[in-house]
Amino acid sequence: MTSEMQLQAQIDVIEKENKELRRRNEELGQTVECQNKQIVTQNWRLLFFASSWIVYGIVSAIKYLWG
């Protein structure tokens, strides 16, 4: 096998590995995007829950002080 053929074989292997890495990278990107959407949804739920308790506490304090 000539050095040119060896180089071509190495290039073929590298291109195949590169293609596989790009595919895996795309899959990971989609997974991360999906997880980010879930986290954002959870954050909004927590924010709503916390803010409702804060409002409840403020209203209770006002009723207690003025009631």
UniProtKB/Swiss-Prot annotation:
Q: Spell out where the chain crosses the membrane.
A: 44-66
Chief subcellular location equals membrane
Give its localization.
Cell membrane
Query: Might you report a single GO cellular component term?
Result: plasma membrane
The record gives the membrane topology as: Single-pass membrane protein
Protein keywords: Cell membrane, Coiled coil, Membrane, Transmembrane, Transmembrane helix
Q: What is this protein called?
A: SPbeta prophage-derived uncharacterized protein YopZ
Q: What is the lineage of its organism?
A: Bacteria, Bacillati, Bacillota, Bacilli, Bacillales
